[in-house]
């Protein structure tokens, strides 16, 4: 906030501000003394010079920035950027332009203006009354619609009801009658007034310029009133009505004077404020019509004012209103403070006036069809007559904007507003409103800083003129003219400020002083002249130049009849016009208020009346259309202007309350603002959320992919800035202060929760394969959260996630995701997915019911619930589509990441229980199959060859009656196998994660690889981590500069704890090994049933009680069926082998199986047979051995099965060595060896990680 | 000329003295009024600054409150099941 001194000095020298008077300091310190502490707090600095210059510097730099964008985003003490205009004006009192004491002080100057002042006050009262009536008429809404229709049942009380209705309506009618009466009386009073002052023979001073203005304004009000009343009557009728009133009196000459005054003011651009200009433009045609009621009169008028001048004014206006955005305003703002303020006012006036004119233009040219954007033909089409007509209609109505269009069709509000603005025009309008509002705000903010400077400048101008210039004139030009020099000295007397020098109180005396002495007499005083002084000065100048006769031909300063030299005339003219500027500059706040008031853009009473509806929908409202435009285009340049339209609402509410004085209008505006603000906040949230989500998605997208992609640009997000919006804690809307930031934060939190919920629901309605997509989308969401958290104080992501997962409780280890995963595993994954051992993937079996179709179809969410922009969503859907049809390692990574260490054990436990229950359920079925086998099964004989073997096997496997049991057992085995394989996948993933973690923590824990591949501790008692921190602590503690090393000691202790924790985490067990041990324990309960202990102690090779016999039979029949193309056998995948081999291995039957399995024996027989046959037929190798024909398929399937079984066994041997399993063996010598231990050979499956022993 | 004869200023000297006094009085008045306005301006800015600082404080308290609520729920879930921790 504090401005560097150099800058202040630069500002000082640039603008040569002389603000060093002692008074200045005293004045500022007057404020300072009461709040000495705030200086210290640096809320804002209060040094008067620095403050003035500093903020002026800011003002200027703001102005410069203004030339680039609609908002100079500067930050005040409250760190809120200025993206809104003035919400409320402190005071709109016009104490300079309107005399607060009704010019009663004019009499003090003894200028015999009593009559004139009385007339002015009378006219001003009439204007005030007229304005009130006009607002009454404008806001008048038909109350007939509100009256109830008379039902048949109430016919008897008809008369009473009508009486009631009459009484209701009577009140309204009486008001209208009153208006009419008032209008008539006001018109006649105006006419009388004009008549009184148009008689040159009456010895009355006046009319003065203020009087002219009052006349014009009253005429304006009357015209407006009349037009409001007869909204559908054509214009000539109205004119004629006035004509009757005015032609009764002879007022032509004053009308002519007024016309000349209007034309000159317009031509010289003398009206500082646009409302004044519009008044002149509105009244001028009326005056012209009134003054040209007869041929003779019009001749005399056109003698004074050439027709061309009038036409030029109108033409200029029309063409001006049609041209688009103006770029001329951006010229450098230079000069001193007064000039800047004047310039600022002029700019504001020009811009706001332009919006009015543009608005009127739009209203007069409704869009015929909603889709067509074509504009009406350019104005060059119109001939002058039409332009004139156009002009009158347009500006006749500007005050209310309800422009009556007499083009023969009724226009609706929709046509004039909703469809009438193209995107470009909305943008331009929004920017222009932004310029107006922010310049207005800026000027208002430096009100108290510049006002003294302004007063002083005005004082100096006036004093310079009356003391210096007038003196020169008195001594030269007017020396001989007694009358005129009297006027001049009157001017001096009534306004000169001779600063404490009583000897110079006498102007006559003073005029004789030497120039040098006079120069030194006045120095600036920061006091402005009063309204009465300016009023009198203007009057006297008029008197001077016109010689007391305004009705002379030529303009106010155009006549040379007064005998005043041209240069003096020029000076007088300049000063005359300056005087009228002074008033508006003195009314600083009120002028800004008028110039930045754009509330008219909301009002639509005229169209409500003509459309016969109660209110238009919000889409038709211009402010909302602008808000909508910003939210729809999402233009980075416009986003910060999104609150500007709410200034329009502020303005119109202010207008409704203070000018129109109608409560119901305010209520309507309030309701609309409520609605549109809610909508805005919601849309804004969506935009912000979508933007950051797109950014996150774009960041997480593989950059090498987007680089190679032909249209990779579409995955980049156009940058947007929301900083300004995030900082808005005080948005002023209709007098309320709204914390927009907290609203956004609140809704953002809600949006995140909704999004998480949506993603979880989506996962819940799909199958297990959707887990990768879920994880992807949650990752994007997390990154989005991270980037938004940089600006807003959002709830923590992990808490939100666990809240939505229903996982908050400390004692619950399940969550929505984990229960869904388990649910899916149980009902869909284990029964319906089959394993492919080679690809390490599960895929859905063909016959597996696609039960996702039975579920409720996933609700399609909005784009911002996925990845923000459409392109990114498509890209991510493409990626996740790759993972949708299988379950493998990537899915397992996603599962581990989503469940985390908290919920994962629950799943593992549930899965193990599932295995155990499946085994238990399998026991009776296995027993049934065992019973169907013969008591004793021998080895297959080689004699019969393959065919013989097949026959024998078929004889053994008499399970035809039990095919159902067989299928069930196969399915059970498949589920057990799938579960086990799932565990092994989980194991692989967990190992990988553990390894990563190990690699990260090893250097800190001082772990180094030993000789035998084991991990060694480099240091015996402590780790590098603790050493480092304890060394740092010691160094800090020993240093005398550190007064309180306790926190470092705590840190060192914490380091020890951390290294202990990490150390204990190193040797985490293997999930697969645990699962195998668990299965083994579950099997032990059924050991007696599935494994017959040989009575002799030797291997009983003929027994059929062992499990491997059943599995062998199942495998054989399954293989046989699987190659039979005629029977559509359900594919069970590789998990059956996993389950069978695991069970056999854990029961200690692996070697029995490898020896006595039917398929293995079958393969052996085929091999032998093949060898023998090929031996016999070595000469005829090319001839395929026909005895093997028909068996290739089954042999191939058996080989495959054997390979698979071997793989499983070797894996099992590696992961679960059965050291303490005991069996019997026979030594090569033939001696039996009881209770020998298995020796485990080194696994062939060496790719699996070894168990650390 | 409309203001001929006795229509001019009665006694220019008296009027001049009155005007001079008026200037001085008004200087005093405008000094006072300007400084009242400055005071008011300051109060407005002070209010704005305070409001936004309070708003940011409120925001932080809100966050803490919500976090506390979540933690309370977690703790209550633990205290209602003491058996789990034994």
Swiss-Prot record, chain B:
> What UniProt keywords are attached to this protein's entry?
Coiled coil, Cytoplasm, Cytoskeleton
Q: Give one GO biological process term.
A: actin filament organization
**Where found, per UniProt?**
Cytoplasm, Cytoskeleton
Query: Which family does the similarity line name?
Result: Belongs to the BRK1 family.
Recorded GO molecular functions are: identical protein binding; protein-containing complex binding
- The entry's protein name is Probable protein BRICK1
Q: Which InterPro entries match?
A: BRICK1
Which residue stretches, if any, does this entry annotate as coiled coil?
47-81
Give the function comment from the record: Involved in regulation of actin and microtubule organization. Part of a WAVE complex that activates the Arp2/3 complex.
Fill in the subunit field for this protein.
Binds SCAR.
Q: Which GO terms describe its cellular component?
A: cytoskeleton; plasma membrane; SCAR complex
The answer to keyword Membrane applying to this record is: no
Q: Which organism is it from?
A: Oryza sativa subsp. japonica
Query: What domain of life does the UniProt record list for this protein's source?
Result: Eukaryota
């Amino acid at each position: 906030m504090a401005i560097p001194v150099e800058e202040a000095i630069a500002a000082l020298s640039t603008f040569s501000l002389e603000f060093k008077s002692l008074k200045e300091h005293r004045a500022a310190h007057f404020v300072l003394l009461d709040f000495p502490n705030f200086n210290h707090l640096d809320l804002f600095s209060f040094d008067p010079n620095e403050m003035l210059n500093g903020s002026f510097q800011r003002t200027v730099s703001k102005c410069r920035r203004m030339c680039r964008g609609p908002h100079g985003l500067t930050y005040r003490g409250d760190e809120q950027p200025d993206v809104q205009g003035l919400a409320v004006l402190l005071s709109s009192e016009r104490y300079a332009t309107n005399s607060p004491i009704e010019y009663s002080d004019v009499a003090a100057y003894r200028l015999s203006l009593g009559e004139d002042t009385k007339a002015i006050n009378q006219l001003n009262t009439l204007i005030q009354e007229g304005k009130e009536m006009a607002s009454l008429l404008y806001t008048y809404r038909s109350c007939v619609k509100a009256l109830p229709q008379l039902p048949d049942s109430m016919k008897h009380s008809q008369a009473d009801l009508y009486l009631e209705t009459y009484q209701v309506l009577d009140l309204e009618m009486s008001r209208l009658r009153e208006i009419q009466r008032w209008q008539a009386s006001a018109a006649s009073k105006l006419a009388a007034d004009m008549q009184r002052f148009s008689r040159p023979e009456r010895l009355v001073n006046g009319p003065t310029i203020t009087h002219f203005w009052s006349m014009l304004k009253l005429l304006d009000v009357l015209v407006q009133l009349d037009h409001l009343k007869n909204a559908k009557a054509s214009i000539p009728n109205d004119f004629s009505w006035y004509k009757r009133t005015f032609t009764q009196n002879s007022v032509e000459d004053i009308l002519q004077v007024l016309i000349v005054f209007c034309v000159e003011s317009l031509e010289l651009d003398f009206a500082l404020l646009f409302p004044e200009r519009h008044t002149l433009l509105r009244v001028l045609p009326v005056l012209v019509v009134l003054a040209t009621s007869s041929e003779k009169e019009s001749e005399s008028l056109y003698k004074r004012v050439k027709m061309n001048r009038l036409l030029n004014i109108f033409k200029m206006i029309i063409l001006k209103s049609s041209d688009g955005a103006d770029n001329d305003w951006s010229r450098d703002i230079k000069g001193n403070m007064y000039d800047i303020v004047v310039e600022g006012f002029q700019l504001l006036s020009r811009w706001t006036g332009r919006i009015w004119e543009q608005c009127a233009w739009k209203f007069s040219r409704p869009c015929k069809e909603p889709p067509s954007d074509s504009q009406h033909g350019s104005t060059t089409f119109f001939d002058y007559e039409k332009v004139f007509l156009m002009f009158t209609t347009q500006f006749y109505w500007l005050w209310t904007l309800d422009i009556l269009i007499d083009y023969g069709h009724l226009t609706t509000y929709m046509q004039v507003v909703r469809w009438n603005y193209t995107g470009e025009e909305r943008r331009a309008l929004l920017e222009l409103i932004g310029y107006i509002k922010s310049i207005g705000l800026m000027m208002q903010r430096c009100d108290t800083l510049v006002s003294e400077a302004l007063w002083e400048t005005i004082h100096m101008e006036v004093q310079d003129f009356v003391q210096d210039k007038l003196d020169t004139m008195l001594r030269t030009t007017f020396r001989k003219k007694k009358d005129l020099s009297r006027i001049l000295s009157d001017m001096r007397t009534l306004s000169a400020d001779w600063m404490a020098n009583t000897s110079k109180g006498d102007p006559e005396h003073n005029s004789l002083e030497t120039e040098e002495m006079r120069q030194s007499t006045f120095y600036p005083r920061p006091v402005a002249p009063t309204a009465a002084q300016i009023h009198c000065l203007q009057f006297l100048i008029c008197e001077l130049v016109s010689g007391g006769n305004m009705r002379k031909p030529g303009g106010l300063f155009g006549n040379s009849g007064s005998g005043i030299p041209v240069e003096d005339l020029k000076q007088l003219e300049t000063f005359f016009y300056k005087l009228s500027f002074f008033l508006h500059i003195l009314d600083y706040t009120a002028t800004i208020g008028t110039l930045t008031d754009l509330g008219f853009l909301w009002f639509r009473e005229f169209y409500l009346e003509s459309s016969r509806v109660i209110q238009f929908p919000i889409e038709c409202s211009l402010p909302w259309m602008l808000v909508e435009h910003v939210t729809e285009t999402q233009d980075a340049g416009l986003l910060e202007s999104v609150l500007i339209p709410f200034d329009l609402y502020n303005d119109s509410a202010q207008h409704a309350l203070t000018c129109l004085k109608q409560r119901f209008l305010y209520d309507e505006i309030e309701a609309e603002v409520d609605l549109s603000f809610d909508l805005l906040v919601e849309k804004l949230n969506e935009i912000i959320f979508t933007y950051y989500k797109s950014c996150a998605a774009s960041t997480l997208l593989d950059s090498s992919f987007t680089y190679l992609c032909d249209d990779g640009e579409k995955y980049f997000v156009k940058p947007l800035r929301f900083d300004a919006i995030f900082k808005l804690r005080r948005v002023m809307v209709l007098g309320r202060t709204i914390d927009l930031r907290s609203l956004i934060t609140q809704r953002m939190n809600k949006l995140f929760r909704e999004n998480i919920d949506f993603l979880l629901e989506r996962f819940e309605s799909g199958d297990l394969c959707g887990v990768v997509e879920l994880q992807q989308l949650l990752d994007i969401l997390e990154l989005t959260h991270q980037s938004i958290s940089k600006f807003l104080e959002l709830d923590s992501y992990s808490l939100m996630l666990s809240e939505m997962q229903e996982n908050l409780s400390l004692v619950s280890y399940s969550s929505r995701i984990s229960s869904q995963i388990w649910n899916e595993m149980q009902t869909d994954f284990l029964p319906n997915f089959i394993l492919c051992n080679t690809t390490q993937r599960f895929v859905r079996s063909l016959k597996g019911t696609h039960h996702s179709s039975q579920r409720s179809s996933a609700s399609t969410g909005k784009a911002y619930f996925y990845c923000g922009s459409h392109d990114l969503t498509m890209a991510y859907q493409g990626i996740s589509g790759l993972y949708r049809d299988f379950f493998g390692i990537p899915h397992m990574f996603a599962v581990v990441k989503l469940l985390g260490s908290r919920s994962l054990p629950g799943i593992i436990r549930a899965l193990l229980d599932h295995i155990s229950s499946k085994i238990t359920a399998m026991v009776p079925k296995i027993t049934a199959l065992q019973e169907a086998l013969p008591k004793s099964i021998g080895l297959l004989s080689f004699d019969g060859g393959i065919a013989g073997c097949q026959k024998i096997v078929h004889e053994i496997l008499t399970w035809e009656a039990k095919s159902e049991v067989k299928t069930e057992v196969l399915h059970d085995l498949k589920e057990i196998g799938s579960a086990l394989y799932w565990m092994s996948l989980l194991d692989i993933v967990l190992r990988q994660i553990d390894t990563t973690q190990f690699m990260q923590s090893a250097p800190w824990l001082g772990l180094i690889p030993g000789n035998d591949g084991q991990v060694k501790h480099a240091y015996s008692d402590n780790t590098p981590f603790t050493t480092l921190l304890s060394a740092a602590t010691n160094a800090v503690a020993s240093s005398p500069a550190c007064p309180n090393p306790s926190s470092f000691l705590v840190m060192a202790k914490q380091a020890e704890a951390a290294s202990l924790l990490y150390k204990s985490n190193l040797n985490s067990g293997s999930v697969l090994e645990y699962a195998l041990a668990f299965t083994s324990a579950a099997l032990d309960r059924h050991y007696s049933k599935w494994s017959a202990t040989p009575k002799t102690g030797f291997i009983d090779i003929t027994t059929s009680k062992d499990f491997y016999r059943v599995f062998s039979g199942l495998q054989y029949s399954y293989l046989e069926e699987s190659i039979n193309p005629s029977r559509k056998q359900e594919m069970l995948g590789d998990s059956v082998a996993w389950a069978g081999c695991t069970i056999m291995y854990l029961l200690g039957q692996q070697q029995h199986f490898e020896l006595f399995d039917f398929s293995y024996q079958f393969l052996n027989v085929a091999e032998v047979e093949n060898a023998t046959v090929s031996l016999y037929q070595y000469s005829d190798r090319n001839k395929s051995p026909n005895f093997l024909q028909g068996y290739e398929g089954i042999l191939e399937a058996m080989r495959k099965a054997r390979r698979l079984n071997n793989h499983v066994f070797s894996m099992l041997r590696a992961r679960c060595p059965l050291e303490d399993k005991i069996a019997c063996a026979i030594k090569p010598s033939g001696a039996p060896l009881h209770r020998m231990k298995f020796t485990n050979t080194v696994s062939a499956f060496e790719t699996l990680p070894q168990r650390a022993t | 000329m409309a203001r001929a004869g006795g229509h001019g200023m009665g006694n220019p000297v008296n009027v001049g003295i009155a005007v001079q006094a008026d200037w001085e009085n008004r200087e005093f008045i405008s000094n006072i009024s300007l400084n009242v306005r400055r005071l008011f301006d300051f109060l407005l800015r002070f209010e704005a600054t305070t409001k936004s600082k309070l708003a940011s404080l409120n925001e932080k308290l809100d966050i803490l409150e919500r976090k506390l609520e979540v933690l309370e729920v977690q703790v209550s879930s633990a205290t209602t099941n003491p058996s789990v921790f034994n």
